[in-house]
Amino acid sequence: MVSVEDIINLQLSKEEIIECIRKTQSVVFLDNLRKRHPNVQFDCKLRGYIGELAIKKWFLSNGIEIEATDYLPDGDSIDIDFIIAGSNIELKTSLMPDVDINIEGVLNKRDIKLIRRNGQSVEKLKGDIHMQIYYQQKTKAKDKWLSKQEVDLYSSDMDYLYTSLKAYAYLSTTFFVAWIDKNTIVKRINSLPVHKRCWSFPNSLREFWVCPLKSSNKPRELINYFKELLFIQGSVDTNHRNMSTYLE
């Protein structure tokens, strides 16, 4: 179970956010789910890269190195996958629903966003580990504000973009809330009645697997998970080398 005290606030600097703005400018993909204002699309991509940078910093500060990163355009957002200790980690980043007062409200009501693709079974879910970041910023209110702004998204003036898009809001509103491993989610979903396994937004083209944040895993437990996995892999590798030397 995850409590509000377990949630980790991932702090970023202005320079780091500007780095993410620059990265967002360099990537273009189409919003194939709904026609959204360019500013909103830009912000969707931006928060994906901000989440990536924030999580990488957090892993490194805890002695965990990321082996590889992959980016997959996904409608109006971007999926970011990491490889750590041979495990595939999928990172999801979301703004909070407007009805949620704060990050505690998100914890009590929301899920890790696990997309059910093309009606597939939960066994087909990609990724070994699924992490969920929520930004303490309200979705509809932010989208409405962004849609009213006149911003040159291709400006070379990073300070202008940082201010015009209110990117400074990401300095302290990035929260790593929870994570879950695939084996656990498969067992949980299969234990539920079929009609209670998925949920969706009104008028949405997507389904999500039921995965409440509160009953998922605490952020800090992910560090222990990978350290144990790396230790086991290191022990196996050492034993393999020792055996190879013996056989020589």
Which functions belong to the PLM regions below?
Residues 1-79, 93-248:
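Nucleic-acid endonuclease domains
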Residues 82-86:
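Active-site beta-strand termini and strand-to-loop segments that position acidic
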Residues 88-91:
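A generic, well-ordered mixed alpha/beta core segment in the N-terminal half of proteins
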